Amino acid sequence: MRAVFITSITGWIACVLIGLEILLPYIFRKNRLSVWLRTAANAASAPYLKRLWPHYWLGYLLLVLGVIHTVVPMQAGHLRQWNLTGLWIATVALLLLLLQGALGLWLQDPKLVGRALMRSWHYWLIFGIVLLVGVHVWLNG
């Protein structure tokens, strides 16, 4: 019973934090959203990559939550009661999340060559992760 609770809590917290994680780069950049949210004044206070520190740490937290959400039910051993397709989809989403974390680490380097391509991959990976997590929640939530 405790494993189900921990798995459920970490999964739903991660779902909410994924949405926040996606919003943070847009909040820390001067645009219509940051003006509307009144965060635009902070958007020019430091270099963009330095302002993104909450985005970085939230990404690390999402990795930890994803691993906990994966390991706890595996150790409990009650996986047969869940939709196996949803579990495989969640496995692919976790692997993409690990790749996303690696790309995020590279993107923190201000001297990175090919930043535009890496940011594009970073964007499309989160799109894929959100899609896979949504299907996982639909099948197993």
Briefly describe each language-model feature range.
Residues M1-G141:
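Membrane-embedded alpha-helical bundles that constitute the cytochrome b-like, heme-associated redox core
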